[in-house]
């Protein structure tokens, strides 16, 4: 139950998603990995480049926007 959280910095704002545009799709880069791994995530609420997110699940990646 006590999974470690992963800090990730928002590097790029890709666009709005969701049926009414309530989520923002962003590209995040993990701060604790040595390989500089980046994934796309959907974020609810206000977010901009340079923000730090604490991700509870680091393996899940959002589908690409069309």
UniProtKB/Swiss-Prot annotation:
<dbReference type="GO" id="GO:0030490">
    <property type="term" value="P:maturation of SSU-rRNA"/>
</dbReference>
<dbReference type="InterPro" id="IPR012340">
    <property type="entry name" value="NA-bd_OB-fold"/>
</dbReference>
<keyword id="KW-0687">Ribonucleoprotein</keyword>
<dbReference type="GO" id="GO:0002181">
    <property type="term" value="P:cytoplasmic translation"/>
</dbReference>
<dbReference type="GO" id="GO:0022627">
    <property type="term" value="C:cytosolic small ribosomal subunit"/>
</dbReference>
<protein>
    <recommendedName>
        <fullName>Small ribosomal subunit protein eS28</fullName>
    </recommendedName>
</protein>
<keyword id="KW-0256">Endoplasmic reticulum</keyword>
<comment type="similarity">
    <text>Belongs to the eukaryotic ribosomal protein eS28 family.</text>
</comment>
<dbReference type="InterPro" id="IPR000289">
    <property type="entry name" value="Ribosomal_eS28"/>
</dbReference>
<keyword id="KW-0963">Cytoplasm</keyword>
<dbReference type="GO" id="GO:0003735">
    <property type="term" value="F:structural constituent of ribosome"/>
</dbReference>
<dbReference type="GO" id="GO:0005840">
    <property type="term" value="C:ribosome"/>
</dbReference>
<dbReference type="GO" id="GO:0000028">
    <property type="term" value="P:ribosomal small subunit assembly"/>
</dbReference>
<dbReference type="Pfam" id="PF01200">
    <property type="entry name" value="Ribosomal_S28e"/>
</dbReference>
<feature type="region of interest" description="Disordered">
    <location>
        <begin position="1"/>
        <end position="20"/>
    </location>
</feature>
<dbReference type="GO" id="GO:0098556">
    <property type="term" value="C:cytoplasmic side of rough endoplasmic reticulum membrane"/>
</dbReference>
<keyword id="KW-0689">Ribosomal protein</keyword>
<comment type="subunit">
    <text>Component of the 40S small ribosomal subunit.</text>
</comment>
């Amino acid at each position: 139950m006590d999974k470690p959280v992963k800090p990730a910095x928002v590097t790029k704002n890709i666009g709005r998603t969701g049926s009414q545009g309530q989520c923002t799709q962003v590209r995040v880069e993990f701060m604790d990995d040595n390989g500089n791994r980046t994934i796309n995530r959907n974020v609810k609420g206000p977010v901009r480049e340079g923000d730090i997110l604490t991700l509870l699940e680091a393996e899940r990646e959002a589908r690409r926007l069309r």
